[in-house]
Amino acid sequence: MGLSFSGARPCCCRNNVLITDDGEVVSLTAHDFDVVDIESEEEGNFYVPPDMRVVTRAPGRQRLRSSDPPSRHTHRRTPGGACPATQFPPPMSDSE
């Protein structure tokens, strides 16, 4: 058994909400779904076995877009493998 929502199109405005073709806003809760038999061939195939699933991209690290901010856990390294030394100006003396 599985859950299926019929007669609705996705809404990009709010999370967990669908807007039906009639314009009705529906919150996505368990009460808004109909119970269906996922092994049934009547309405289409609801279950795809893992070995038959289509992979659209290879798993792995995602590349950052230029608009993405760097992660605070990302450390940039020099080609030698060591972190570059931070250079600060010399401290000011009392005479300055």
UniProtKB/Swiss-Prot annotation:
GO terms for cellular component: host cell Golgi membrane; host cell plasma membrane; membrane; viral tegument; virion membrane. It comes from the Viruses. Myristoylation and palmitoylation (probably on one or more of the nearby cysteines at the N-terminus) enable membrane-binding and Golgi apparatus-specific targeting and are essential for efficient packaging. Phosphorylated. Phosphorylation does not seem to be required for recycling to the host Golgi apparatus. Packaging is selective for underphosphorylated forms. It holds the Pfam family UL11. A motif (Di-leucine-like internalization motif) lies at residues 18-19. Residues 57-96 are annotated as: Disordered. Residues 87-96 have a biased composition (Pro residues). The keyword Phosphoprotein applies. Keywords: Host cell membrane, Host Golgi apparatus, Host membrane, Lipoprotein, Membrane, Myristate, Palmitate, Phosphoprotein, Virion, Virion tegument. One of its GO terms (biological process) is anatomical structure morphogenesis. The keyword Lipoprotein applies. Disulfide bonds: none annotated. It is found in: Virion tegument; Virion membrane; Host cell membrane; Host Golgi apparatus membrane. It is a lipid-anchor. Interacts with cytoplasmic envelopment protein 2; this interaction is essential for the proper localization of each protein to the assembly complex and thus for the production of infectious virus. Interacts with gE (via C-terminus). Interacts with gD (via C-terminus). Interacts with UL56. Belongs to the herpesviridae cytoplasmic envelopment protein 3 family. Plays an important role in the cytoplasmic envelopment of tegument proteins and capsids during the assembly and egress processes. Also participates in viral entry at the fusion step probably by regulating the core fusion machinery. This is Cytoplasmic envelopment protein 3. It comes from Human herpesvirus 1 (strain KOS) (HHV-1).
